[in-house]
């Protein structure tokens, strides 16, 4: 594992104070202090931001780390952080950064791992790490994907190997995209591709439109 990531996840940083702006952002998403602590979401020391990313991000003032749990135990060697302020580029606003060429991984809320892997209860696949944590806090088996294309590796439309241990046959799977999939072509296409990939594994897929998206 990246030694800097390993150090940041160590007990040395247990109980460390989050930047007020970062903490407010997490609470705005409905996350409890217990969830934040359990998932080891913590402030990245400013002098460690560039080191963890592997490149210089001069406009970033502060950031918090979003560690990715390995459903088999421990933590993945994977760096992803929310940065403040968000970065404005010609292609749009960037709120999250990670090392280049690091690909995507599936996000497993720890409180839900056992139910995700071993239960026949409906599974919720939620776009966004924080949203997936908020759903998991309700006691629902939940996994998160980073962006609507975050369920597969580049160059493949098969489900990400991180989902190999998740029982899907004859299981209801509710997809919760972060956007109105009915009107956005790119989101609509990605949702249908994800549904097809899940159905290929025997899942019974439903797409959930959140109330604020139905307006």
Feature locations, PLM:
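Phosphate-handling DNA/RNA-contact segment within nucleic-acid enzymes
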Residues: 51-172, 187
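N-terminal structured subdomain of primase-like DNA metabolism proteins
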Residues: 1-71, 75-80, 88-99, 133, ...
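TOPRIM fold recognition
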Residues: 1-18, 26, 30, 116-123, ...
């Amino acid at each position: 594992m990246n030694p800097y990531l390993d150090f940041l996840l160590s007990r040395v940083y247990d109980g460390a104070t989050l930047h007020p702006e970062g903490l407010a952002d997490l609470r705005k998403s409905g996350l409890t202090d217990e969830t934040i602590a359990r998932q080891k979401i913590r402030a990245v020391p400013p002098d460690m931001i560039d080191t963890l990313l592997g490149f210089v991000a001069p406009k970033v003032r502060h950031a918090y780390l979003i560690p990715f749990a390995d459903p088999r135990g421990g933590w993945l060697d994977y760096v992803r952080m929310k940065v403040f302020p968000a970065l404005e580029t010609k292609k749009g606003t960037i709120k999250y950064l990670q090392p280049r060429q690091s690909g995507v991984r599936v996000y497993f809320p720890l409180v839900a791992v056992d139910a995700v892997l071993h239960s026949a209860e409906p599974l919720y696949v939620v776009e966004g790490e924080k949203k997936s944590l908020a759903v998991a806090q309700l006691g629902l088996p939940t996994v998160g994907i980073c962006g609507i294309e975050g369920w597969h590796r580049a160059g493949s439309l098969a489900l990400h190997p991180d989902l190999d241990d998740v029982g899907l046959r004859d299981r209801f799977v509710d997809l919760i995209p972060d956007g109105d999939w009915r009107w956005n072509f790119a989101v609509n296409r990605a949702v249908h591709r994800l549904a097809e990939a899940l159905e290929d594994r025997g899942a019974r897929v439903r797409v959930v439109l959140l109330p604020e998206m139905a307006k």
